[in-house]
Every structure is written in C-alpha cells, then in structure tokens.
Amino acid sequence: ERGTITCLMGRNGSGKSSLMWAIQGATKSSGRVLVNHEGSWADPRKADAATARRMVSLVPQSASDLLYLPTVAEECAQADKESGVPAGTTRAILSRLRVELPEDRNPRDMSEGQRLALVLAIQLSSRPDVVLLDEPTRGLDYAMKTELTRIVKGIAAGATGDPAAVLLATHDVEFAATTTDRTIVMATGHIVADGSTRSVCTSSPGFSPQIAKVFHPADVMTIADVERLVNTPAAVSYTHLTLPTKA
C-alpha cells in the first residue's frame, strides 16, 4: 500500500532477496505478482520495460552495481532518458532527498551512502509504485543509517514524487525498528510471522533489537522510546540499570 514501509526479515537463505527479484520480474517464478498501477492491478513481469519500471524499482544489495558512467551528471542524465522524464528530474530528486553530489564526481570516488543515495534517485526517476530495497544499510555507519531512515520515510510519504509502497529486506533490526511499519519474517521461502514491526520484533528473541533486550520488560524499541522513558516522572528500575527520576 502506498505510504507504507514493510520490512522483510529472516535468516540467510530464507528467500527475502529471491522474493524481491521475483516481484521486480528479473527471475522466473510461479504464482502471481500484482501491483496497483494507475488504478488497476497488473503483473509487472508481464508489462513492457517502460511500464514495469514505473511499477517496481529495485535497489540491490550492491547498489553501486547499477552505476557505470564516469560522473554523477551522466548517471542522472541517463536515468532521465531511460525513464522518459524531463532533463534534470533525477538531479531534482537528489535535491529533494537533501543529498548534494558534485556533478563531475565519479561515483567510484563517493562513499557507500552517497552511492546509495544516487541509485535511489535514479530508481525513483520513473516514479515507481513500489520501491524495493535489498539490505540498504550494508556498509553504512550510524549517522548514515539515521539519514537513510529519513530518506525512506520521505519516499513512502511522497517527498520525491507520488507516495510509494516501500518493501525492504534487512538483518538490521535497529534500522527496521526505527523505519518500518510492518514486518514479515520468512523461513525457507514461507511467511512465519506478519504484523507490526514492534509486535513481531518484541515477540521474537532472534529479531529483537538489542535495546529492547536491555530494557525488557519495558516497551522499548528505539532511542526515541528510551528518551520518552527517561523523561517519565517516576524512576524505572531494572535488573540491568536504574533510570533517574525526573526532577
């Protein structure tokens, strides 16, 4: 659903990436994939290339694999051409993402986070209905993960165009807790859990953020939750720590 961010979790080999590539249409698969495109349901795997690009865009685990031109400007211009949009569209998306990249910069000379932002802008140039992100936090530090949370929420909300449905696969439970609305857990190609990210992660020790384990049994998943807890009027004591009473 547009405006939502859903997380796919599961151990290696559970089928997360395979599902994403099947949705995108790059791999043969059985069953049906239906995307609500321009008011009707359609299978992106059966659409022509231009229509499929407007339905689903995928950012793979190694986002830099999609970058092959020598400058940011050329990458943006090529994306505009392939998406059939006015010149400058991809560059404008970068600006809306609040990411400033010199036009003459070679993508190979950029940080992992900068390359990811460029690939996101390229994939968003077609204004897709669904955006797929496969392990987007790989190689990112805490500050960039925080920035990525802002970017992903903006994509879902329509900050870069029309609101999109975002589906991301990750092992990063802290990122999932701060970024996603819903979490689906997969095992050997099957769904074994599906619900709000908070309920799924707190009910499964294997997918619970470290911060939730430290503050158990309090309902804590994120740093923001900790700040709210610390600022409550009464002191809260646990086996691991004591939070001070607010004066």
Predicted regions and their residues:
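ABC ATPase nucleotide-binding domains
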Residues: 1, 207-241
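Conserved ABC ATPase "signature" region
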Residues: 85-102
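ABC ATPase NBD Q-loop/coupling interface
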Residues: 34-51
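Conserved beta-strand-loop-alpha-helix hinge in the C-terminal portion
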Residues: 190-214
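H-loop/switch region of ABC-family ATPase nucleotide-binding domains
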Residues: 170-171
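Walker B catalytic motif
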Residues: 106, 135-136
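A short, surface-exposed alpha-helical micro-motif characterized by mixed small hydrophobic
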Residues: 176-178
